[in-house]
Amino acid sequence: MNHRHRKLLHALFSHPLPTNLDRHDVETLLGEIGATIDRTSHGRLMIKHEGHSVSLHASERELSKDDVVHLKKFVEACGINPERDFPI
């Protein structure tokens, strides 16, 4: 995982929640950690990793705060800790 992806993963867990996360960058990050990403016919992204799944809006360029919260919970449920697994 390159430095840009690590910074993005750490930003996901920062406080306050970031509102400028680019959807394409997040898709690339999730691909790096081994998640599978499928586009549904309803304009959503279905992300699956280690038996966990989350659905995000795919139509917007940046993720909404709700999507960021769902994504953060998904990453935590998958057992990924950015401080431990991917230090900057």
Which residue stretches match the model-derived regions?
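Basic nucleic-acid-binding interfaces
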Residues: 1-88
